[in-house]
């Protein structure tokens, strides 16, 4: 998708906030513990390369992404530290990963056997992390016999270097620790079955690190916290108070491109879902659902100048309209999503409005919106 550099709509990312969040977490780590910065999905919409470079400078041990292409993007940007692909990569691409020093997740024994076929006639060695399904129900080993067989397969197998073993918590963002503890027990049990020694054992994500005393592990996979966002949907719960300060880094801004007065009975937008009951001032903003600002945001209040104004009518593919209490000049700044947690249109409020999580709101903002980076 072509970035709209000739349109007044941008996602602003404060690299100063990114830096502070990473530094705060690194100060919170246990002695000897390291951090993998999670920059998948284009850094949760913030920009993977730019965020990775900040984390690299501060001292992150490496990076996590979701797919092989994201890892290759970091390598092309001269990121040289460890990069782990958390998702399942087709075994046929194992040589590409190995040639680029990219670590892959092993979901099961069958994957290992297939990957070996592509590696055995080369001089390449693939770095792997053994994935454990401790209760997420997604990918990884969950049966003892299969994990034991995989360990046996890897013994004295020069095609693979066992760099890590990991799992992912399903409910570390909950104050009820019952399932969290169940997952800890399952992971520790699977760890006891190891006959090969990984370089790194890791299970803590952002939520586990800032809310709980998780498993003693070599690494913390720090994801949503990098971007200054609380992983909990209930951050005001006293049981889920973050152990570190989090500084939101993203704002989404545009401006008024058209202002007019409509009259009683006039409709706004497709289907005329808003009909004026009196003379009403309407402003148009050049952003729509094609940018990832979905139609469910109809009615959400954005900040036009210093005034919160509701979105009226259905959000269009490329534009939306707001009802304003007074006429404002063309070019007036419109903050659609604020990086100030005290503002009514912060990203958590936006997520709540459309009944989702702020992860999704940030990730929805696509490449048609240019990213502008600054440091406060």
From Swiss-Prot:
What cofactor does its activity depend on? pyridoxal 5'-phosphate
Tell me which Gene Ontology terms the entry assigns under biological process.
D-alanine biosynthetic process; peptidoglycan biosynthetic process
Pathway assignment reads: Amino-acid biosynthesis; D-alanine biosynthesis; D-alanine from L-alanine: step 1/1
| Modification type N6-(pyridoxal phosphate)lysine: residues | 40
Matching Gene3D superfamilies: Alanine racemase (3.20.20.10), Lyase, Ornithine Decarboxylase, Chain A, domain 1 (2.40.37.10)
Q: Name one GO molecular function term.
A: alanine racemase activity
Q: Which SMART domains match?
A: Ala_racemase_C
Active-site residues per Swiss-Prot or TrEMBL entry = 40 (proton acceptor), 270 (proton acceptor)
Query: Which Pfam families does this one have?
Result: Ala_racemase_C, Ala_racemase_N
Annotated binding of substrate, by residue: 138, 317
- The kind of enzyme this is, by top-level EC class, is isomerase
Cystine connections: none
Query: Which EC numbers characterise this protein's activity in its record?
Result: 5.1.1.1
Any one GO CC term of this protein is: cytosol
Q: Which UniProt keywords are present, listed alphabetically?
A: Isomerase, Pyridoxal phosphate
Q: Which residues form the signal peptide?
A: none
Highest taxon of source: Bacteria
Catalysed reaction(s)?
A: L-alanine = D-alanine
What's this protein's function? Catalyzes the interconversion of L-alanine and D-alanine. May also act on other amino acids.
The record's similarity note reads: Belongs to the alanine racemase family.
Name of the protein in its database record: Alanine racemase
Q: Where does this protein come from, organism-wise? A: Lactobacillus gasseri (strain ATCC 33323 / DSM 20243 / BCRC 14619 / CIP 102991 / JCM 1131 / KCTC 3163 / NCIMB 11718 / NCTC 13722 / AM63)
What phylogenetic lineage does the species belong to? Bacteria, Bacillati, Bacillota, Bacilli, Lactobacillales
